Amino acid sequence: MITTLEKKFFPVLNGEYTRITAELLYNSNGKYYYISINPEKVERRANYSTVTVIPAECNSYKLQTVTRRTKKQDRLAGEDFSALASVFVKKKAESIGVELEA
């Protein structure tokens, strides 16, 4: 499981979201990265879940969608969603060369 060290708000540049709540995580390279699992959305779009990896020195970042989930999938996942989101975070982090400590 990924450990949250701190939470921070980031403005998002694509205009679809006002801000994202990001969790500050530590990786094995000794650098800090903000990882967002659930953005705060302006419009109600419950069928989308996103994961963003942000270098700690950034003040804003363009939101990157890495997966699409339907409302039915969210309902079926229930409490398992946070564990599922952790997997998405790890995959996203690995795709940009960031190794996260478990």
Task: State the predicted function of each range.
Residues 48-102:
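Mixed-charge, Lys/Arg-enriched low-complexity segments
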Residues 1-32:
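Negatively charged, low-complexity tracts enriched in Asp/Glu with abundant Ser/Thr
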Residues 26-59:
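Amphipathic alpha-helical interaction modules
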Residues 2, 13, 35-38, 62-66, ...:
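A general, composition-driven signal for non-globular sequence regions
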Residues 18-26, 33-37, 81-89:
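Extended low-polarity, hydrophobic cluster-rich segments
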Residues 2, 20, 35-37, 54, ...:
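Weak global preference for isoleucine
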